[in-house]
């Protein structure tokens, strides 16, 4: 028997996300997942790696995001939060990341790297934990 242990959604690409009790799936994947991304002045989206479309921005992983009334809310490491529709969000993100950025809503091309949905089994997590004993998986 299969059991779902956790459901996660990531409102802003490459930021930590939010645990959800339920999600709605549609053609593009989980509703609201990676619907927003941080974009640099060259038009590349912030990510953990650099590719043709994405640029590595190291401090992204220190931030998390969740939704409040369909608006992404960014949480900073100090616990402070800022809504995506706050006029000061771009200044705060740019200051934190050390470069000028914008918060971009998805347009014609999705913000997904490869796939809109990922299913990770607990056995795969256990396998990874065995190989990385000094890390919390």
Task: Give the positions of each predicted feature.
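Electropositive, beta-rich accessory/interaction domains or terminal extensions
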Residues: 1-137
